[in-house]
A protein has these predicted regions:
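Conserved helicase/translocase motor-coupling segment
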Residues: 1-81, 110
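C-terminal accessory regions
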Residues: 47-151
């Protein structure tokens, strides 16, 4: 990013299993500081320490966004599947209304960047039943298949 171009990390408010990547959506981010803070303000998006969810970024744009994916919205067997993390495991979302809500959350996140974005899909961890590689690999492969470049 150049000059005054703003960048930051955005995630689904349901992305509970990004904590091993130091992303905890349960920590409340102040959108005023995140969007308006200067480059020397540790609360600003520039520091890439605090993330914003679809609630904090709706209606606002960044020049550059890093969208960090989680296992709540997965591409598998040629369709998008929706999950909610409850207790110690992912559970299938059954209600159509909640499925649509999650899909729209990711739509908001994917439309926040004016100039460009990076989509981060974690590798997963075979030793963590909540972050198995298969929760992420098919989404990652789908993005590559539709032409999103790997960097």
């Amino acid at each position: 990013a150049r000059g005054t171009e703003r960048y930051g990390i955005v995630v689904s408010s349901q992305a509970y299993r990004l904590k091993p990547m130091a992303i905890d959506v349960r920590v409340e981010t102040d959108p005023v500081h995140w969007f308006l803070g200067e480059k020397n303000d540790v609360r600003s998006s520039y520091y890439l320490e605090d993330v914003a969810t679809e609630f904090q970024v709706q209606g606002l744009e960044l020049d550059w966004a890093c969208v960090t994916w989680d296992g709540d919205f997965r591409y598998s067997n040629d369709e998008w599947k929706t999950y909610s993390f409850v207790g110690n495991k992912w559970q299938n979302i059954k209600k159509e209304e909640r499925k649509l809500y999650l899909k729209n959350a990711y739509r908001v996140l994917l439309t926040r960047a004016r100039q460009g974005m990076v989509i981060v899909v974690p590798e997963g961890n075979v030793e963590d039943h909540t972050r198995q590689p298969e929760f992420y690999n098919s989404t990652y492969e789908y993005f590559k298949r539709i032409g999103i470049k790997e960097i």
